[in-house]
């Protein structure tokens, strides 16, 4: 039998998830809109977040597969990340997890940049701009027992 006091006294499992591009930092990177095998326009991440593709358009994310160019932190969000990482370090093992969940295919450029700031964070590259991919990853974490999830992302689609 499960007792109410057992439920109330157990430590909650908290997951804090941060997007990277245009949430924690802005860098010189473009998404190239392709049609018929050629680039017809380029979008920054903020423009891409609200862009509705036309039939026949596809995207080229090559700028997101290499070292960050001219990255600039978004200070208030990075400070929040640092606070969440500090809480995770001070909590019971496994009670708190902080993750950078990025649409990028390669996490290393993000990891390297964060380490240059003295931030050691777990980076998960999902390799897709489809919001469902991030949602599916978060759902898997909930199924692993996380009962409180905080999510920060610049894109309303996510």
Predicted regions and their residues:
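Short acidic, low-complexity intrinsically disordered linear motifs used
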Residues: 1-10
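A short acidic-Thr-Gly-centered motif at the start of a beta-strand
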Residues: 9-11, 86-90, 138-144
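Alpha-helical substrate-recognition element adjacent to the catalytic core
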Residues: 13-132
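Conserved Lys-Pro-Asp/Glu-containing loop-to-beta segment of HAD-superfamily phosphomonoesterases
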Residues: 14, 134-157
């Amino acid at each position: 039998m499960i007792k109410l006091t057992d439920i109330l006294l157990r430590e909650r499992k908290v997951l804090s998830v941060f997007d990277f591009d245009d949430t924690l930092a802005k860098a010189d990177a473009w998404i190239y809109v392709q049609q018929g095998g050629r680039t017809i326009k380029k979008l920054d991440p903020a423009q891409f977040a609200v862009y509705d593709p036309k039939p026949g358009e596809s995207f080229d994310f090559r700028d997101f597969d290499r070292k960050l160019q001219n990255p600039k932190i978004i200070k208030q969000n990075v400070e929040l990340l640092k606070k969440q990482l500090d809480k995770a370090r001070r909590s019971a093992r496994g009670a708190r997890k902080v993750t950078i969940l990025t649409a990028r295919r390669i996490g290393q450029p993000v990891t390297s940049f964060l380490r240059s700031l003295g931030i050691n964070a777990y980076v998960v590259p999902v390799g897709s701009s489809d919001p469902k991919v991030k949602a599916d990853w978060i759902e898997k974490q909930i199924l692993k027992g996380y009962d409180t999830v905080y999510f920060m992302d610049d894109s309303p689609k996510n």
